[in-house]
Every structure is written in C-alpha cells, then in structure tokens.
Amino acid sequence: MKVTLSALDTSESSFTPLVVIELAQDVKEETKEWLKNRIIAKKKDGGAQLLFRPLLNKYEQETLENQNLYLVGASKIRMLLGAEAVGLVKECNDNTMRAFTYRTRQNFKGFDDNNDDFLTMAECQFIIKHELENLRAKDEKMIPGYPQAKLYPGKSLLRRLLTSGIVIQVFPLHDSEALKKLEDTWYTRFALKYQPIDSIRGYFGETIALYFGFLEYFTFALIPMAVIGLPYYLFVWEDYDKYVIFASFNLIWSTVILELWKRGCANMTYRWGTLLMKRKFEEPRPGFHGVLGINSITGKEEPLYPSYKRQLRIYLVSLPFVCLCLYFSLYVMMIYFDMEVWALGLHENSGSEWTSVLLYVPSIIYAIVIEIMNRLYRYAAEFLTSWENHRLESAYQNHLILKVLVFNFLNCFASLFYIAFVLKDMKLLRQSLATLLITSQILNQIMESFLPYWLQRKHGVRVKRKVQALKADIDATLYEQVILEKEMGTYLGTFDDYLELFLQFGYVSLFSCVYPLAAAFAVLNNFTEVNSDALKMCRVFKRPFSEPSANIGVWQLAFETMSVISVVTNCALIGMSPQVNAVFPESKADLILIVVAVEHALLALKFILAFAIPDKPRHIQMKLARLEFESLEALKQQQMKLVTENLKEEPMESGKEKAT
C-alpha cells in the first residue's frame, strides 16, 4: 500500500525531541500559534507535518522563566518519507548504493519496520532542518502580528523569521547516551590510534567527518616526512646539497598524498552515499537583498540585484581594502625586522645568556601579532563579503575563502620569503620558521579549544545550580540540557580548521630544505589537535546540523596550489645554497637556467603523478558507471511505457470519431 504524507499522524503528544526552536521573548501569541500550525499542518496544506510542542507546559511557564523554547520531532514514517524527499542514498541488500525510496524500503540493508536505527540521528535532524527550511509562504502577505515583516509567495518562512528576529535560533539537540559512547572511542583516552570516522559521521554528519578524516590522514602522512627529516636536522644541518634529496622527496610526497586523499575520500563518501547525491538548485542566501522581481530561471518572485553593482563593490571597495590590509601586514613585518636587528645588536654587544634568549622574543611577538591580525582581518573579510551582496551561499563562501587565504598566506609567509630571498639569512629563516610554527600552534590550541572549554564549563556549573534549585515538577534533565545547549557557542563550520591545516602544510612544504624538523612539530601538534577538536565538537559548541559533502571542496585546490608554490621555493632555496653556487662560480646565468629547468621538471613530474593517479578507485568508477547505465535504462523503459499507453489510446479515439 502506498503511504502518503497526508496519512501521517501529527497529534503525538510525546516524541523524541531532535531540534529546538528558540523564539524572541516578546513574540506575540498569534505568531506562535501561526508558526505551530504551519509546522504541524499536512504537507498538502503547505505545512511541514512535523511534531511540535513547547519545552514547558502552561503551568511550568508560569512557575519558571518562560524561555520561548519549542521542541520539534517527527514520526518514523515521516522520517522515512523525508529521507526520500532529500535524496538520501543508502546501501541495498545487493551491496549497491541507491537513493532511498519508501516504496522499496525493504530492499535496503539494515531496514526493519521495528528498527529505529536505519536513519542516523544526524540524518533525522538534517531531514527536519530541510522540512523547516522548505516551509513556504502561501497567500500570507505578512507574518501574523508583525505587519512590517512582509511575506512573498514561495519564499522560505524560516529564513524570514530569522532575519526578522522573531526566531532567535534553530539548533539540533545532543543525544547524551550516543555522545558518551562516541567520546569513549574518540578522545577520552589519549593514544596513537585511528578515529571512529564512521561513528563521527553518524553523529555529526559527513562534512565534519570528512574534516576529521582529512586531519587524521594528513597527520599519518606527515610521519614519513618527520622520520626522514629528523636525521637530516641532526646530522647534515649545513649541507644544503644533501637537502636536495629531502626536498625532492617532499615535492613528490606532497603530490602523492593529495592524490591518494582524493581516492580515500571517494571511498568514504561512496560508502556514506554522499558521492551519489544530486546537487540541488541553490536558493538566495538569507542575507541577500535587492529589488523584488521575477527570476528568469525559476519564474518565481525574489529579490534581484544587478551584477555590475556587485562588481563595483568588489573592485572599488573590497579589492582596495584587501590591498591596504596587505600593505599594513608588510609594514608590520618591517617593524619585526627592526626588532630582530635590535635584539641581534644587543646580543652581540653583551653576549650573555639573557640576550641569547632575547633573540627569540621578536619572533614570538610577531607570531602573536600575526594571529591577532588574522582574526581581525577575518571579521573584516566577512563584513565585506556580506556587503558585496552575493546571491548564493557558494559564491559568498568562495569570495570569503579567497580573501582570507590571500591575506593569511602573505601575513604568515611574507617574512619567511623576505628572509630567504632578500636577506638570504638561512639561520634566521630556520629560527623564524620554528618560532612562527610552534607559537601559532600553541595559540590556536588555547584560543580554539581550551579557552572556550573553560568558559563552557563555568556556564554549565551555573545552569546545573539553577536547575537543582527548581521545585517545579518538570523533566529536569531535558530542561537542563536545552537551557545549557542554547547558550553554547555556535560552531561556524570547518573553515578555520582547514585554514589552520593549510597554513601548517605551508610551513612544512615551502621551506622543507631549510627546516626539515617542521614535519615533526606538525605531527605532535596534530595528535593534540585531534583530541582538542573532538572535545570542542562534543562539549564546547552546539551540535551542528549535518551537511552532506562529497569532498573537502575548494580546500583541495588550495592545498594543491600550495604544493605547486613549494616546488618553486625549494628549487630557489637549493639554487641559492653555497654548495650549489660553488659549482657555478662565474656564470650565474647557467645556474639560473639549471634551477628553472629542474623546477619545470619537478612540476611536470607533479602533474604526471596527478594525472596517473585516478581520483576515484577503479571499483567505484565501475559502480558509478553501472548506476548511470541503470538510470538511463529505467528512463528509457518509462518513456517506452508512456509511448505504448499513448498508442493504445489513439485507436480508441479514432474509433469514436468514426462512430460519430
């Protein structure tokens, strides 16, 4: 029997809460009632057909401080039909991956009518988020109770409620039992081990699981570099000609690990089903604004903003501002070099142990200033990118990433390039590289994990005391959980985490022939990073909504670009070494030609390796080709069925015409 959404029951008074909606304190009752009715209404009537109830009943709201918090869930059948609507891909009994449909649910591995574990909690929360975001305005002209909050047919109600300040936030709840199991296998025991990536994916979703998978992969990939770099550092410190072998290995290593990651990523995302998920049509991002008009593609009414105005904002405001920030970064760099000269002069005059320690102070101060500048610039870049008024979220993210990467690259590495190619002081280069790398790692650990964790612990203690003081007859556990989680910080995505790895990759690869110990420090940091990031996700931030991902996106290109730049810098550094210069004492032109030739040969080798190593393993390519073939065959059969039905109808119509 075919089950439709209209047949589902939405009157369950008790259900498993998955998502919390927080409304503003002064929201009017008619607005609350309207929102509730739209959420629980049947799909055919324009509702989401979800389960919805307040955290506190009327008596509890009178007894306690009314927080305007509401819980959202869904019945099992509603979840399964929602999984079909969002296009979730699951493993079938024949070990193939296919888009889930409720009609063929028995064909999927692990499905049972009495089993509630077929969909992960992250998938269930993603489905609820999808349904809430797809609540559309119908014939309403405004939000009830708020005449200034205009509504337009077909536009998302949730986005309008958020931008109007009526809805404060929407967030998924943690599952305490599942979270405890995940913590026990993930980070509670500090040890050299693989992470439970599939469990992370089941709890947090594919985007976060891919980050932790990449962090783990990158850390283990650094171990050969660290093992080889350690003896080079200890035994051949000044023999730059011997670093040629190490640098060449580094360049091949950086190419191979990035290509092998793409294969490993394809394996994971195929197993999770996200490699097969179709890309959906993007709607305007919440912050997009413009004059109301008709979209020429969708035919729907939405805000329109001329492209030339956006380009003017980018080239006349954003670009000059970025250039000004880059200039300021270079100015700060020159102040740092003045401090280095001052510290060196002081040490040469006195030669004491105190002044030998003082030699590292300018680099430490500069590293701290770099971190501060990076964070301040990030806020400015977000403001500018939002002001540019990009229509799509993907365009917004691409412009933001470009701004941040350019500034961070120059801010972090400009001083090292200046020391290497202008001052040509290899000793100072090693010292600066080591100090910048280690200081930035320590600061990131403190600012991103330990400080937020300490603040969250203090807040948690206050909430527990408040709940223990309550005399009301309520579900104290759920109440405490919701109150605690709503005050947690919001996880803003994997942007900063990937950026940290990107800069670390730069420190390791750009100047490997000068400081081979960088990989060892990166490995030590990343083992700590895995645990601190896990703690951050589980105990510091709100649980983020799951976001399906097939790869790490634009960051793959960023890492590949960094590996290409590292070829140029390492070849140039080796060409500048005294040992190599001694081979060409008279003709510098010959030296330059040979260095350029070697650099081109290594770049050619990189591109050959990248081409020779397929992005997807052979067995996955075969499975994808098979699925594409079956989809085309199914489409042909459907078309043939329609043609056959039309041919059957034609004789009947012609017979009627003859009879008349």
Swiss-Prot record:
The lineage of its organism: Eukaryota, Metazoa, Chordata, Craniata, Vertebrata. GO terms for cellular component: cilium; intracellular membrane-bounded organelle; membrane; plasma membrane. It is a multi-pass membrane protein. It is linked to Spinocerebellar ataxia, autosomal recessive, 10: A form of spinocerebellar ataxia, a clinically and genetically heterogeneous group of cerebellar disorders. Patients show progressive incoordination of gait and often poor coordination of hands, speech and eye movements, due to degeneration of the cerebellum with variable involvement of the brainstem and spinal cord. SCAR10 is characterized by onset in the teenage or young adult years of gait and limb ataxia, dysarthria, and nystagmus associated with marked cerebellar atrophy on brain imaging. The gene is ANO10. Residues 1-207, 262-316, 374-400, 522-553, 612-660 are cytoplasmic. This is Anoctamin-10. The chain crosses the membrane at residues 208-228, 241-261, 317-337, 353-373, 401-421, 501-521, 554-574, 591-611. Residues 229-240, 338-352, 422-500, 575-590 are extracellular. Keywords: Cell membrane, Disease variant, Membrane, Neurodegeneration, Transmembrane, Transmembrane helix. One of its GO terms (molecular function) is intracellularly calcium-gated chloride channel activity. Does not exhibit calcium-activated chloride channel (CaCC) activity. Can inhibit the activity of ANO1. It is found in: Cell membrane. The term 'anoctamin' was coined because these channels are anion selective and have eight (OCT) transmembrane segments. There is some dissatisfaction in the field with the Ano nomenclature because it is not certain that all the members of this family are anion channels or have the 8-transmembrane topology. It holds the Pfam family Anoctamin. The keyword Transmembrane applies. Highly expressed in the brain. Intermediate levels in the retina and heart and low levels in the placenta, liver, lung, duodenum, kidney, testis and spleen. In brain areas, highest expression in the frontal and occipital cortices and in the cerebellum. Lower expression in the fetal brain than in the adult brain. Belongs to the anoctamin family. One of its GO terms (biological process) is chloride transmembrane transport.
